[in-house]
Regions:
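A long-range scaffold signal marking pre-active-site subdomains of enzyme folds
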Residues: 1-235
Length: 235
């Protein structure tokens, strides 16, 4: 008969709710690649505070961009913004950029000490020739765009460019028992106070949206304010 469907969760790295750790305490999940932000960035108070690279904050940029080293005219684009629209191009009013991979998600590997599978679901290596790579061997370049234009001022556009760097082929087949499906976890913690959030899906508009039960938010100082709705959709 037809074999059971193999489901390999890539990651649920959401604080304590989905965090998975190895026996030695290492995080299993998506982690940022080094070199795409300034790891020694200090904030205005003189405190070490690295952030993802932001187009309006030069202190968040790395000294060069690893993905631009092959540029023949300006290898690494040093001191230039690594913009989606080109070198030093600021099309959006604010653009963020970071790169992550799931190589550290080794929960489906073999424990080097016991030589036993770490997971009850078995062993999976996305690149059998390299057992140090976990997850699905996926690398994702993420860009976030915001514009101040009144038609888009309340919207963040997020572009995910996902690359399979491993040796396994995840292409969908006609039998429907293989392939990769993209999803997103959203935490509708609206209004700085949780416990009364709701979410729903509008099938006609193809939008997931969330709202606060009483429509009232609370500032850290205790003052209250009216809340709106927030929505999420794949384009």
């Amino acid at each position: 008969g037809k074999s059971d469907t193999l489901v390999n969760p890539v990651v649920l790295t959401y604080r304590e709710a989905g965090k998975r750790l190895s026996p030695d305490g290492s995080l299993w999940g998506w982690l940022p690649l080094n070199g795409f932000h300034n790891e020694t960035r200090f904030n205005r108070l003189g405190e070490l505070e690295p952030t993802p690279a932001l187009s309006d904050d030069r202190t968040s940029w790395p000294s060069f961009w690893p993905d631009r080293l092959d540029n023949p005219d300006d290898p690494g684009w040093s001191n230039e913004w690594n913009g989606f629209f080109g070198r030093g191009v600021f099309n959006a009013d604010l653009e963020g950029f970071y790169v992550i991979d799931d190589y550290s998600d080794l929960e489906y590997s073999v424990d080097p000490e016991t030589q036993q599978p770490l997971s009850q679901w078995g062993v999976f290596y996305p690149s059998p020739s390299d057992s140090t790579i976990g997850g699905l061997a996926l690398q994702t370049k993420v860009r976030i765009f915001q514009w101040a234009n009144i038609l888009a001022e309340d919207t963040a556009f997020i572009l995910y460019r996902i690359t399979n760097t491993g040796e396994k082929d995840y292409r969908y087949n006609s039998s429907g028992d293989e392939g990769v499906f993209f999803g997103q976890i959203m935490d509708y913690g609206l209004g700085n106070e949780e416990g009364d959030e709701n979410a729903a899906f509008d099938a006609l508009q193809d939008v997931t949206y969330g709202w606060d039960q009483d429509g009232i938010g609370q500032h850290p100082d205790g003052t209250l304010y009216d809340l709106g709705y927030t929505g999420f959709a794949f384009l």
